[in-house]
């Protein structure tokens, strides 16, 4: 179970989606801080604590990553491939949250180690319902593995 102080990292380039997801999280009662990375390279820099993300008091390591697939600079599947190639990130919870429902994307995301594949809802009510489901399962019920020795601090 994640504590309400643990950060969620949303990887999303569409500012409208960021706004609506933030609203849905608020309505669902998710208290966790939400950090946003707008492209694939930013999420890699964030997870490595590099560049502007070096200050871990300002940019804490996330308990959960919500990853869009269609991103500028580096696509979501490439980010997922990179995450799973890093020994210290093997247990990081990465959920794909995308507008694609293409079965090839679904299969590839799971093959690369996504823990879930969620299609972004269009309506506000469905977004709030999704946020509640994320809260209940991933933040309240699920016991995530530790990041293990040598994992991020």
Predicted regions and their residues:
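Non-catalytic signal-transmission and effector/linker regions of two-component phosphorelay proteins
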Residues: 1-9, 15-35, 41-44, 48, ...
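Alpha4 helix (beta4-alpha4-beta5 surface) of REC/receiver domains from two-component response regulators
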Residues: 3, 19-23, 77-78, 101-118, ...
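Short amphipathic alpha-helix used as the core "switch/output" element in two-component signaling
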Residues: 52-55, 77-90
């Amino acid at each position: 179970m994640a504590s309400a102080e643990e950060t969620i990292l949303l990887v999303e380039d569409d500012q409208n989606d960021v706004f609506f997801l933030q609203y849905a999280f608020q309505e669902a009662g998710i208290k966790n801080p939400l950090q946003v990375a707008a492209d694939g390279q930013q999420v890699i820099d964030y997870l490595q604590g590099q560049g502007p993300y070096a200050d871990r008091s300002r940019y804490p390591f996330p308990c959960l990553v919500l990853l869009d697939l269609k991103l500028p600079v580096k696509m979501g599947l490439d980010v997922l491939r990179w995450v799973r190639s890093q020994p210290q990130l093997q247990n990081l919870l990465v959920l794909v949250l995308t507008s694609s429902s293409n079965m090839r994307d679904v299969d590839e995301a799971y093959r690369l180690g996504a823990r879930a594949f969620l299609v972004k809802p269009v309506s506000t009510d469905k977004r709030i319902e999704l946020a509640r489901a994320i809260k209940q399962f991933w933040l309240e019920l699920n016991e995530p593995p530790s990041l293990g020795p040598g994992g991020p601090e």
